[in-house]
């Protein structure tokens, strides 16, 4: 701790990302990265950009990417905001739409960065408990005196998806505040709320290229919503960093968005492997929460999750253990869906425990 720290710095409880050990080669099933390469078209576009154009600043408006996303989602370009990963997009949304003095509602078990943003912007979290089956109950989001609502769909780390009708019920119950729907994993089996954007001016949908498009390394995320909401994010961005996306990321992201056939191929492969992995894990006695993501959330009634995590790590396989002190999920493991070969290696290792 430095004597130059402000009270704000000292009060922060920063996000702890999944471990990235460098001591040896691991089968990485802990950070929900894609086991597959990005679109070949994206790789080709990025290689060309590296070789010829890095002396130039990127387009601060990210016009080509916004146009590609707008076309993909059947929106106007002014309904698209682009940022340096969905985490930056979320941070700007929290700053701009939720730091208004009232609490912000989100689930008690969800993406842990929300609490970090709340602390950073002095927002009081209003935690809405998931039910005993780890479901979000729309009725719990009615009659709230809050600055906004954040819903993760599918939820993380549980992997459960919320039907579109439930998202709409939450929107109807909160017409005077922004409802942010974080859809980082939506391509793996959930219903997107994008179709509701033109009907609900308070809806902001946030997505990423890190998961289904296998581009975690270039850090590109985006928000979709009513043009007025997007304009607010643009004002914040241009008051902080006018060039959030570098030239290489911009061309790679655009090519990936345009390659919808490759997106479908990756998602289909991941879903098929996930369903087989669920069967394999259940055969070993694990209980699996139904998943619409590229991971599964698993617990074993007779085995300690922390010990499983440590043993797997010793054998070169990384899974995510959030800590035995976490209420309700202290004996769960989050397991990213890898290739068929990687998941077979996981199953083989678990059989020996």
From Swiss-Prot:
Gene3D superfamilies membership: Aspartate Aminotransferase, domain 1, Type I PLP-dependent aspartate aminotransferase-like (Major domain)
UniProt keywords, alphabetically: Amino-acid biosynthesis, Aminotransferase, Histidine biosynthesis, Pyridoxal phosphate, Transferase
Catalytic activities: L-histidinol phosphate + 2-oxoglutarate = 3-(imidazol-4-yl)-2-oxopropyl phosphate + L-glutamate
Annotated signal peptide: none
InterPro entries in the record: Aminotrans_II_pyridoxalP_BS (IPR001917), Aminotransferase_I/II_large (IPR004839), HisP_aminotrans (IPR005861), PyrdxlP-dep_Trfase (IPR015424), PyrdxlP-dep_Trfase_major (IPR015421), PyrdxlP-dep_Trfase_small (IPR015422)
EC number: 2.6.1.9
Cofactor(s), by name: pyridoxal 5'-phosphate
GO molecular function: histidinol-phosphate transaminase activity; pyridoxal phosphate binding
One example of a Gene Ontology biological process annotation: L-histidine biosynthetic process
Pathway it works in: Amino-acid biosynthesis; L-histidine biosynthesis; L-histidine from 5-phospho-alpha-D-ribose 1-diphosphate: step 7/9
Record keyword Amino-acid biosynthesis present: yes
Alphabetized Pfam families for the sequence: Aminotran_1_2
Residues modified as N6-(pyridoxal phosphate)lysine: 211
Subunit structure: Homodimer.
Family note: Belongs to the class-II pyridoxal-phosphate-dependent aminotransferase family. Histidinol-phosphate aminotransferase subfamily.
Name the UniProt record assigns to this protein: Histidinol-phosphate aminotransferase
Species the sequence originates in: Marinomonas sp. (strain MWYL1)
Record lineage: Bacteria, Pseudomonadati, Pseudomonadota, Gammaproteobacteria, Oceanospirillales
């Amino acid at each position: 701790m430095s004597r130059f720290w402000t009270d704000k710095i000292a009060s922060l409880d920063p996000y702890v990302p999944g471990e990235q050990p460098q001591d040896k080669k691991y089968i990485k099933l802990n950070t929900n990265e894609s086991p597959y390469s990005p679109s070949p078209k994206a790789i080709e576009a990025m290689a060309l950009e590296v070789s010829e154009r890095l002396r130039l600043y990127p387009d601060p408006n990210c016009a080509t990417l916004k146009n590609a996303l707008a076309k993909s989602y059947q929106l106007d370009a002014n309904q698209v905001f682009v940022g340096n990963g969905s985490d930056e997009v979320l941070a700007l949304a929290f700053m701009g739409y939720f730091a208004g003095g009232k609490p912000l509602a989100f689930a008690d078990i969800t993406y842990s960065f929300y609490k970090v943003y709340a602390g950073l912007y002095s927002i009081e979290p209003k935690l809405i408990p998931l039910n005993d089956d780890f479901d979000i109950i729309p009725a719990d989001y009615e009659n709230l005196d809050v600055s906004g609502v954040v819903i993760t769909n599918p939820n993380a780390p549980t992997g459960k998806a919320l039907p579109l009708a439930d998202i709409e019920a939450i929107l109807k119950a909160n017409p005077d505040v922004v409802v942010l729907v974080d859809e980082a994993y939506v391509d793996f089996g959930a219903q997107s709320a994008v179709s509701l954007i033109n009907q609900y001016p308070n809806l902001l949908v946030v997505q990423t290229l890190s998961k289904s498009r296998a581009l975690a390394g270039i850090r590109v995320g985006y928000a979709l919503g009513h043009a007025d909401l997007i304009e607010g994010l643009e004002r914040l961005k241009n008051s902080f960093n006018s060039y959030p996306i570098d030239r290489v990321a911009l061309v790679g992201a655009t090519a990936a968005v345009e390659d919808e056939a490759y997106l479908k191929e990756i998602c289909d492969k991941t879903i098929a492997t996930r369903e087989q992995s669920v069967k394999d894990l259940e055969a070993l006695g694990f209980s699996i929460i139904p998943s619409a993501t590229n991971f599964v959330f698993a617990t074993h009634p007779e085995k300690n999750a922390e010990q499983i995590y440590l043993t797997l790590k010793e054998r070169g396989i990384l899974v995510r253990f959030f800590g035995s002190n976490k209420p309700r999920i202290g004996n769960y493991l989050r397991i990213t869906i890898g290739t068929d070969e990687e998941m077979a290696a996981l199953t083989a290792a678990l059989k020996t425990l």
